[in-house]
């Protein structure tokens, strides 16, 4: 029997298809270790056929470390394929889908995704989504639009517990001195939580090594003494 090049190509294609099926099944396995290995395999040998399934899996994967590997796998694929799928996903009704898509967009870092970072996402009622949006916004914001972003982020000052406030302060500090006008305005807000958060963020702008706990503590002391922390600045 003579084996032709065409026959060999067919065998190769069949093997590739079988491997793809195994990987896709692995992404849905009940064992997190298997899902992790499957995501690693997809990222190690990128295949455009996997993109939609990776995005879909991000929306429902329960384990953080597997989700992180899924994000890594997506960053290994062509942006021309991942970007449209992720931009669609940030409009999903499922909060984890929005959050993970935003996280992945921040890792890809392509500014063409910027229009997808809406005010609605930056103030999302789901804290994880909002925090992901803040991080993505800082990475994707076009040159010259940082001040406008700072004004939107300032509307979230005082929100949530320590970790949420720390995430927002980090995002604002990453934007640099352009956030100062928004922070000065927020530091005079009637809401004491907003005021304290703004003062703490200003402290971190001046001294990023100060630490959030120290900065928020200092802000509260200033407020207790009846000052705004603006004197002499």
Q: Where in this protein do the model-derived segments appear?
A:
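Amphipathic alpha-helical scaffolding segments comprising HEAT/armadillo-like alpha-solenoid repeats
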Residues: 5-26, 45-60, 79-91, 110-123, ...
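Short inter-helical turns and helix N-cap capping residues of alpha-solenoid HEAT/ARM repeat scaffolds
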Residues: 30-31, 62-63, 93-95, 125-126, ...
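Non-membrane alpha-helical segments in proteins
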Residues: 33-41, 56, 64-76, 100-103
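Conserved hydrophobic register position within alpha-solenoid helical repeats
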Residues: 38, 70, 101, 133, ...
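Alpha-helical adaptor scaffolds
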Residues: 95, 103-105, 119, 127, ...
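Eukaryotic acidic, Ser/Thr-rich intrinsically disordered low-complexity regions
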Residues: 184-233
């Amino acid at each position: 029997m003579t084996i032709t090049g065409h026959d060999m190509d067919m065998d190769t294609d069949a093997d590739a298809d079988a491997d793809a099926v195994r990987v896709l099944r692995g992404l849905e396995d009940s064992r997190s270790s298997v899902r992790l290995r499957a995501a690693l395999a997809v990222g190690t040998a990128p295949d455009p056929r996997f993109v939609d399934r990776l995005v879909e899996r991000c929306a429902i994967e329960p384990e953080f470390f597997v989700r992180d590997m899924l994000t890594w796998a997506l960053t290994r694929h062509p942006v021309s394929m991942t970007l449209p799928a992720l931009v669609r996903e940030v409009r999903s009704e499922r909060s984890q889908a929005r959050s993970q898509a935003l996280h992945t967009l921040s890792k890809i870092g392509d500014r063409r995704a910027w229009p997808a970072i809406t005010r609605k996402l930056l103030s999302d009622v789901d804290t994880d989504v909002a925090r992901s949006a803040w991080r993505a916004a800082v990475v994707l914001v076009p040159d010259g639009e940082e001040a406008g972003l700072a004004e939107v982020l300032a509307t979230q000052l005082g929100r949530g517990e320590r970790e949420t406030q720390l995430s927002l302060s980090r995002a604002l500090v990453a934007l640099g001195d352009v956030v100062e006008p928004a922070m000065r305005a927020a530091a005079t807000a009637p809401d004491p939580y907003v005021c304290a958060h703004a003062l703490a963020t200003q402290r971190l702008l001046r001294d990023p090594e100060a630490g959030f706990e120290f900065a928020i503590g200092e802000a509260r002391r200033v407020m207790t003494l009846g000052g705004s922390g603006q004197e002499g600045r």
